[in-house]
């Protein structure tokens, strides 16, 4: 169902009904529902796309322009899900979602995220420091030493500033 969910998310606004355990995609005008999904029908990849849209909408509410690379390109997004910009600020974001409440990120996953980010960002660099954020619903997903490992790579080649951000998505 993943491709179908991502396609529908790119067409409208996300609404999550926690009481009914339903995810709705509403038209951008808010006049009608494009699609609705029961929680039980969604797999982990679907939830990943839903989280990307949720994070993007949070930044839209803060006045950022949001480009949804993950929703439009899927696994070909180059390791970057969202690009946000406002005035002369820009950040490249990788979103990672899990329904687990405990650490589930290993060092290999962090290295993979950094590898993909460096490949993508090297093509974006134009003599101005770039911002790369790893956004998760809770830092509990990443053990403290792996958070420190991620941040120890900060300012790699003095071109990119790394940050860990949390944006909770209640279910």
Model-predicted regions and their roles:
Residues 1-171:
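Mixed-charge (Asp/Glu-Lys/Arg
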């Amino acid at each position: 169902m993943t491709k179908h969910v991502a396609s529908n998310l790119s067409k409208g606004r996300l609404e999550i009904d926690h009481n009914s355990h339903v995810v709705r995609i509403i038209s951008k005008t808010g006049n009608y529902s494009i699609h609705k999904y029961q929680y039980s029908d969604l797999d982990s990849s679907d939830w990943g796309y839903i989280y990307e849209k949720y994070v993007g909408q949070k930044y839209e509410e803060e006045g950022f322009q949001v480009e949804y690379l993950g929703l439009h390109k899927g696994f070909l997004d180059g390791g970057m899900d969202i690009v946000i910009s406002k005035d002369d600020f820009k950040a490249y974001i990788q979103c990672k979602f899990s329904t687990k409440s405990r650490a589930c990120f290993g060092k290999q996953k962090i290295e993979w995220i950094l590898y993909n980010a460096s490949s993508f960002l090297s093509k974006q660099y134009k003599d101005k420091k770039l911002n790369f954020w790893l956004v998760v619903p809770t830092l509990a997903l990443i053990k403290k030493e792996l958070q420190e490992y991620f941040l120890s790579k900060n300012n790699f080649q003095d071109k990119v500033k790394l940050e860990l951000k949390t944006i909770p998505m209640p279910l």
